[in-house]
From Swiss-Prot:
It comes from Ginkgo biloba. This is Unknown protein 9. The lineage of its organism: Eukaryota, Viridiplantae, Streptophyta, Embryophyta, Tracheophyta.
Length: 7
């Protein structure tokens, strides 16, 4: 997805 927490 496009989360700030995604790596």
């Amino acid at each position: 997805s496009t989360d700030a927490l995604s790596k």
